Amino acid sequence: MAEIHELSEILADQIAAGEVVERPASVVKELVENAIDAGSSRIDILLEESGLKMIRIIDNGSGIDANQVEIAFKRHATSKISSRSDLFKVGTLGFRGEALPSIASIADVEMLTATTDGPGKKIHYRGGKLEDSGDAQSRQGTDITVQDLFFNTPARLKYLKSLQTELSKITDIVNRIALSYPEVAISLQNNERELMRTSGNGNIQQVLANIYGAKNAQKMVHVKEQNIDFTIDGYISLPEFTRANRSYITVLVNGRYIKNFQISKAIIDGYGSKLMVGRYPVAVLNIKTDPILVDVNVHPTKQEVRISEEQTLLDLISKAVFNELADKNLIPDAVDNLKKSRVKVSSSEQLDLARMAISGSFEMEQDHVTIPDTDNDEVEKEVNISDRYVEPEPIVINSRQDLKSDTIAEFKTKYANDAVVNNTVEDGDQPELKEKDAVQRFPTLTYIGQMHGTYLFAEAEDGLYIIDQHAAQERINYEYYRVQIGEVSDDQQDLLVPIYLDYSTTDAIRIKEKQTVLESCGLFLEEFGKNTFIVRHHPTWFKKGQEEDTVKEMVDYVLNDSSMTVAKFREATAIMMSCKRAIKANHHLDEPQAKQLLKDIAKAENPFNCPHGRPVLVHFSTTDMEKMFKRIQDPHHSDLMEDEM
């Protein structure tokens, strides 16, 4: 048996570095967090070759006393905690004292630091060994340079990606830190090229504009909610501004960026059916709570935490997101979706746009902005822009009221005596519809015509609307089924021929565990043998001829989501049924049916999106139409024409 011995300090530091320092972005994160803990109001980050050759962090924080600099490079040396009790109420970003010795063990590190009234100190480590140390002149703060990262651990270099990928990792973490601390001015350069800069004035909206582009920042709304334990404050995107994955959700706990799937999911759940399938919101949410409720000592990078009363927090987040989006106008501007626009702005506006057009790491498109050579701010030039053009906030048609109708009685009061527009649905399948005197929050539309049996055209005082007839009736159906499924009744339709369902042993066990969930929607499965179930009757709202398919889909929801709850199951079932019963594409409606559909969708609680999040209608304003047909004249051109006349 090999002899047990104690590892050398340098080797121990290199092992620790394997957990703390995975790539250049890890070094940037640890050093910038140290700068923030030191009370810095300005942090400059300079890179060469995406940090592999050099990382330099300059801050104006409190600095380190000259006689404590060498101690700072020892393992588990820190000024941030001193007792066991401090570990359970950490109020700083760092606290373990591992970052500096870990980085120094696998790189060439030089630090210059000074406090307000003390002498400066310069120290140099390479591969964990002290190379030089002495007094030096320095302003208050810390200037630390890391070179030749992983020079003595070449195996680590093999796992690094391209320079561009490593740079994107760095800009990603810097952007998230900038969102966490808008009061800190942060700049980032790579190979002397500036990638981002924040003003440090505390305005998070300006930081959002720097990262996502000014125009996209306009599509984010403020959300704030609190209870006795938590305060949440941040910005979430409108459903029209989404991304293909959830990595654009930034969750902060007491200013610390964390990764938490459940919190991200709570944000998404708050959108309900407003998001398209496969699309995710952009969000920045800062959760403030007593540090004693958060355990940050569970992961080497401190990006995973444990939160007490987590379910209460998740419910609070979903509620806040839902309430904030509830009264917003969600009709997308059709012209706004065009990739490029030719617009006329003043020189001063162009300069503002150029300042905003600083590239971020979240895959933002680069826009071309031409700055004219003129001192006259009133001279107008044409400029090509897209996502970063600052437009006014969209006009909210009206605030939504009476968001929920919890009973079928309310639904029937809302829709009485009007026929549902769908001649593919059997008579009596849906309740009759009736107009309700309610606060106007949807444009008054006048039907014009139909295209390809798919889209309806209508006009209003503010322009042209194009309606997706399938999405519109999906929304109407969804709100009906949501009420029906939520009000489980004893009314069941007996099957002439029972449905037999065979499953694997694993699936059968899971189905039995979720019996109450299935029964919450009126679906009763009886055991019929080892792994077989029988269905003898079904809810009356099942579509005729699709009973077996509907049962199988409902069971699949339970099998595919181990955390399926009654509420989620009812929601999924309502969405499924709404799609099955909706008008399909290439189905031509006559004029009375089309007009009825427009009346019905206007009375929906959310007339703007189908249950899958797709828009029900898009809007071309009168101004948009006049621009497209060149009916709006350049004022300078008009003056010339008048002079010629």
UniProtKB/Swiss-Prot annotation:
GO biological process, one term: mismatch repair
SMART domains recorded: DNA_mis_repair (SM01340), MutL_C (SM00853)
GO terms assigned for molecular function: ATP binding; ATP hydrolysis activity; ATP-dependent DNA damage sensor activity; mismatched DNA binding
GO cellular component, one term: mismatch repair complex
Highest taxon in the source lineage: Bacteria
Alphabetized UniProt keyword annotations: DNA damage, DNA repair
InterPro entries xrefs: DNA_mismatch_repair_CS, DNA_mismatch_repair_MutL, DNA_mismatch_S5_2-like, HATPase_C_sf, MutL/Mlh/PMS, MutL/Mlh/Pms-like, MutL_C, MutL_C_dimsub
CDD domains hit by this protein: HATPase_MutL-MLH-PMS-like, MutL_Trans
Family affiliation: Belongs to the DNA mismatch repair MutL/HexB family.
Function (record text): This protein is involved in the repair of mismatches in DNA. It is required for dam-dependent methyl-directed DNA mismatch repair. May act as a 'molecular matchmaker', a protein that promotes the formation of a stable complex between two or more DNA-binding proteins in an ATP-dependent manner without itself being part of a final effector complex.
Protein name: DNA mismatch repair protein MutL
